[in-house]
Design a protein with these regions (language model features):
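N-terminal beta-strand motif that seeds the catalytic metal site of vicinal oxygen chelate
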Residues: 1-18, 79-80, 132-137
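Vicinal oxygen chelate
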Residues: 3, 93-137
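Short glycine-enriched loop/turn motifs at secondary-structure junctions
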Residues: 4-6, 73-77, 109-110
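Short hydrophobic/aromatic beta-strand micro-patches
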Residues: 13, 81-85, 119
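Amphipathic alpha-helical segments
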Residues: 16-31
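Short amphipathic alpha-helices within nucleic acid-binding modules
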Residues: 23, 88-95
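Short secondary-structure junctions
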Residues: 29-34, 103-106
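Conserved short beta-strand elements that form part of the metal-binding/catalytic scaffold
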Residues: 33-74, 125-132
Length: 137
């Protein structure tokens, strides 16, 4: 059986692009790779890409010169986790406090990992997790 090499893209659907982009760039430090009115692609590390789509702007098929991207959209808050180093946990906690981003929760996992939970401007639940969360992380 062929093997999956990793998760490449994760999509979030946002009400307004500017505050969403500012949050992920200014607060979390992700680097923009592409930015249009309907889409922002951010470098999420280790070949990972976070795609921010303006709500309703990607629900129709998008024909292009090299093929058609099927339409997609989502609604409601979703959850995503970013991997962080254990030694950066307190630095991230301080950075969120400095930016006045309230923590929803902190969790100490049985395998030794720790997580910080907070929300982005669209109410999506964001997690920063250290190693020790899953058998493979």
């Amino acid at each position: 059986m062929p093997r999956i090499a990793g998760l490449l893209e994760t999509s979030l659907y946002v009400a307004e692009m500017a505050p969403a982009k500012a949050f992920f760039v200014d607060v979390l430090g992700l680097k923009p790779m592409l930015s249009t009115e309907r889409l922002t692609a951010l470098d999420a590390g280790r070949q990972g890409v976070l795609l921010l789509f303006l709500e309703g702007a990607s629900d129709a098929d998008m024909p292009g010169p090299n093929g058609t991207v099927p339409g997609h959209d989502g609604s409601g808050p979703v959850h995503m986790a970013f991997a962080i180093e254990a030694e950066d946990y307190d630095k991230w906690k301080a950075r969120l406090a400095q930016r006045e981003i309230p923590l929803r929760s902190e969790v100490a996992w049985p395998r030794g990992g720790h997580s910080l939970y907070f929300e982005d401007p669209d109410g999506h639940l964001i997690e920063l997790a250290t190693p020790g969360l899953w058998p493979n992380y």
